[in-house]
Amino acid sequence: MKHSSWHDLIKRELPNHYYNKINTFMDAVYESGIVYPPRDKVFNAIQITPLENVKVVIIGQDPYHGPQQAQGLSFSVPDNLPAPPSLQNILKELAEDIGSRSHHDLTSWAQQGVLLLNACLTVPEHQANGHAGLIWEPFTDAVIKVVNQKETPVVFILWGGYARKKKSLIDNPIHHIIESPHPSPLSAYRGFFGSRPFSRTNHFLEEEGINEIDWLN
């Protein structure tokens, strides 16, 4: 992270010494119990997707809390694991919108410029939202603010009430926001299904002269 395109710009948005606080927090939680994702994958979203490459942002809440699921990318799991319910619904909507994708691992999206950002970057095993409100939100809000400052258009995809609260951080008029209910089984039928976020994103990118995302790759 230290040498990434993000580092200094994020640092400007944070209180003094906040990176030190994050490192101290991670030292403590990884030494005291099982935490996901593996420590070397915590910052995967911004390590795989450099700031200059960001075309799309998909905001999640926190990592999956089961063994081997979390990869540091929102909604993504390794291909050898079953898709969790929200990801199943994302892939179902993708199939209806554009076409079928067999991969559960969304790294290829990240490599194309889709920033798969969770608001909270770590979670204790089997404790959803177990690290919420402790350290990460100022950092990930800073990431969103840095993307908001970009001079090239970005699509922000906000699924569910939690992600939609981040809308207040996105005030640059060149960007485009797509909102819908969350893809979880509890809310997918309330407007996520049929929202066509993938084709709508590509339509916006095409109109702006930006290469589209190959969502099926």
UniProtKB/Swiss-Prot annotation:
Q: Write down the HAMAP family for this protein, in alphabetical order.
A: UDG (MF_00148)
Q: Has the keyword DNA damage been applied to this entry?
A: yes
Belongs to which family?
Belongs to the uracil-DNA glycosylase (UDG) superfamily. UNG family.
Name of this protein: Uracil-DNA glycosylase
The GO annotation for biological process reads:
base-excision repair, AP site formation via deaminated base removal
Which organism is this protein's natural source?
Streptococcus agalactiae serotype V (strain ATCC BAA-611 / 2603 V/R)
Q: What is its EC number?
A: 3.2.2.27
Quote the cellular component terms of the Gene Ontology held in the record: cytoplasm
Keywords linked to the UniProt accession = Cytoplasm, DNA damage, DNA repair, Hydrolase
The record's subcellular locations are: Cytoplasm
Just give the chief location class.
cytoplasm
Q: What Gene Ontology terms describe what this protein does at the molecular function level?
A: uracil DNA N-glycosylase activity
